[in-house]
Amino acid sequence: MPIKRTSNSGFTLIEMVTTIIIASILAAGIVTYIGDSTDGFLTSANRSRLASSGRSALDRMTFEMHNALPNSVRANAAAGNGDQCLEFMPMLRATTYVNAPFTGSGSSSFNVINFNPTTTVASPAGIYAVIYPINNTDLYNYNDNRGPLALVDSITDPNGGDGVMTITLDAVHRFNRRSPSNRLFLVDQPVSFCVVGDRLYRYENYGVQNTQCTPATCLPNTLPNRALIADEIDNTGLTAFALEAATRRRNAIISFELNMTSDGDSVRLDHEVLTHNVP
């Protein structure tokens, strides 16, 4: 009976070592590729988050600046991570005055054309009447009873819908300039945005001050009058807010610089806003 031969198959030591080396090279390449891809994704996601946070802050400030009273903007342009602040007065209403006091010793009440929408206030808190503000120095000099700004005590409709309202001030006042278009604004208390350390805050309800307030002087430091707008800011060597005065050919320009940073990644955002300067 013939003997059936069987063949033995296998691999040599050299083949095994070569296979291990090739597999190791492929594994290292795959791990490196996956690691780089993951790092790239995380970096991209982090930068996207920073950009989104910074853009939201800029959009918020831009929206409010479009409603700023003409010539009410003032900026503390100190560079770095100190108290960099931007201040303005938000407009509430605008109308035409009828007999505002400009001469003599002044008056504590006068008439205006009805606001649109109709506005009557029995005891307004921090509402001011403003006529023809031409610069922020004059505007914020609130202690002067002959300036462009006066605190409102009440707004009433004494004749029941005849189209004329009466504004009563908290004290006798004489406005120092007539508006060429008889324009009157109602404004709220000033609002400030400040970069303090690595955070951007919004401040309100601190009153009108001759000198611009900072967090170290007269701005509130608790909720609800201080609100966090953004964090992760490193403005070292940068100026968060800069005001370029208006000229005869263009409006005033406010420049914003925010450098958002986290985990070694940074995104710098530069933005400019044109402000109204026709009072």
What is the meaning of each model-derived region?
Residues M1-F11:
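N-terminal leader/signal peptides at the extreme start of proteins
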Residues I3-R5, S72-D83, S123, D157-G161, ...:
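Intrinsically disordered, low-complexity coil segments
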Residues S9-H66:
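Aliphatic-rich helix starts adjacent to a transmembrane/signal segment
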Residues T19, M91, N259:
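Acidic/polar N-terminal loop/beta-strand segments that form early-domain functional surfaces
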Residues S24-G29, I34, G197-V208:
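N-terminal trafficking/processing presequences and adjacent post-cleavage segments
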Residues D39, T43, R55-D59, F63, ...:
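Short helix-loop boundary/capping segments at the starts of domains
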Residues S48-Y203:
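Extracytoplasmic beta-strand-rich oligomerization domains located immediately C-terminal to a leader/signal peptide
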Residues R199-Y201, N205-P279:
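Short linear sequence signals and composition-biased patches located at protein termini or domain-edge surfaces
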